[in-house]
């Protein structure tokens, strides 16, 4: 068994929370392990002047950390799973999916105003095409503004009065103790989350069997089923672009329920569908369900929507 582990992580407050959480959990199970953190500045942390959708790189927040992992300068990488591309680099693997936090999105607004009660032409901040598409389908009048930076920076920009509201993932808001700022938690019926939202993905080298065995204690089986279904769906649809796709899976007693959304950026077109599969006994079956639902969405017209988006990316 290894005596030392080096965890690679971004240096943002949320990324550090995630890495420290992982360190604490591993230390609880393996108290003799010497665990340290290596902070890595990623492309996504540096390129803050452009919207994520315009940069177009699928590994903005992960690939720079993965370089250290491939070079054996770190033993594992801790990511927000929603930031991890569905195809990992050769030689790397997601070895653990941590138990998921609440997957929903939240609205932060002035005076606690709920989303549908925001004034006409309200300025709503988000960096996500997925959120933009679903927001515009509900409120075409919204003036969507791009916002970048870590969570603390976003709250600072909001407090300076640049926006009427902003949309964030509940998980990050909760983990960094901003829950008292939440104006509304949006149900999945109107806002499907990003694939993998709320979970952490712990990435290792495929051939590092000792580390893979160690991080298995962090794996949450239900989360693995759900996230593999969602990631399989996204992989089948994506084609290398930042596109407005939302998905949420639940899994209990062998039954998987998977919801998905594909929409145009301006919110004028949107397709939702769902699938339920019973008797599942392996994550591979959950992945197959993701592909099946992706095919249904394509038949419903998702291909037309995605083709239009790919012309601009």
Swiss-Prot record:
UniProt record, GO biological process: chlorophyll biosynthetic process; protoporphyrinogen IX biosynthetic process
Protein's pathway: Porphyrin-containing compound metabolism; protoporphyrin-IX biosynthesis; coproporphyrinogen-III from 5-aminolevulinate: step 2/4; Porphyrin-containing compound metabolism; chlorophyll biosynthesis
PANTHER family (UniProt xref): PORPHOBILINOGEN DEAMINASE (PTHR11557:SF0)
Catalytic activity: 4 porphobilinogen + H2O = hydroxymethylbilane + 4 NH4(+)
Protein name from the UniProt record: Porphobilinogen deaminase
A GO cellular component annotation in the UniProt record: cytoplasm
PROSITE patterns: PORPHOBILINOGEN_DEAM
Lineage: Bacteria, Pseudomonadati, Chlorobiota, Chlorobiia, Chlorobiales
């Amino acid at each position: 068994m290894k005596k030392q582990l080096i965890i690679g992580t971004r240096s943002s407050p949320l990324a550090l929370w995630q890495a420290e959480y992982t360190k604490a959990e591993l230390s609880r199970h393996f108290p003799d392990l010497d665990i340290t953190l290596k902070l890595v500045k990623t492309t996504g942390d540096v390129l803050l002047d452009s919207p994520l959708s315009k940069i177009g790189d699928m590994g903005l927040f992960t690939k720079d950390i993965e370089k250290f992992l491939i070079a054996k300068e770190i033993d594992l990488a801790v990511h927000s799973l929603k930031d991890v591309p569905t195809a990992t680099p050769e030689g790397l693997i997601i070895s653990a999916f941590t138990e998921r936090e609440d997957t929903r999105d939240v609205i932060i607004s002035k005076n606690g105003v709920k989303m549908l009660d925001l004034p006409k032409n309200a300025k709503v901040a988000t960096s996500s095409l997925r959120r933009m598409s679903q927001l515009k389908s509900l409120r075409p009048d919204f003036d969507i503004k791009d916002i970048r930076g870590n969570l603390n920076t976003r709250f600072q920009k909001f407090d300076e009065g640049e926006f009427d509201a902003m949309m964030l993932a509940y998980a990050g808001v909760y983990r960094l103790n901003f829950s008292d700022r939440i104006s509304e938690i949006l149900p999945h019926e109107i806002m499907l989350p990003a694939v993998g939202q709320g979970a952490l993905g712990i990435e290792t080298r495929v051939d590092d069997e000792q580390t893979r065995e160690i991080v298995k204690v962090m794996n949450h089986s239900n989360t693995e089923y759900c996230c593999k279904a969602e990631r399989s769906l996204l992989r089948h649809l994506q084609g290398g672009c930042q596109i407005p796709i939302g998905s949420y899976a639940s899994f209990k007693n062998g039954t998987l329920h998977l919801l998905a959304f594909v929409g145009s950026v301006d919110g004028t077109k949107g397709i939702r569908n769902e699938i339920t599969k019973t008797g599942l006994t392996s994550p591979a079956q959950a992945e197959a369900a993701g592909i099946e639902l992706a095919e249904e969405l394509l038949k419903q017209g998702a291909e037309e929507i995605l083709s239009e988006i790919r012309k601009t990316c």
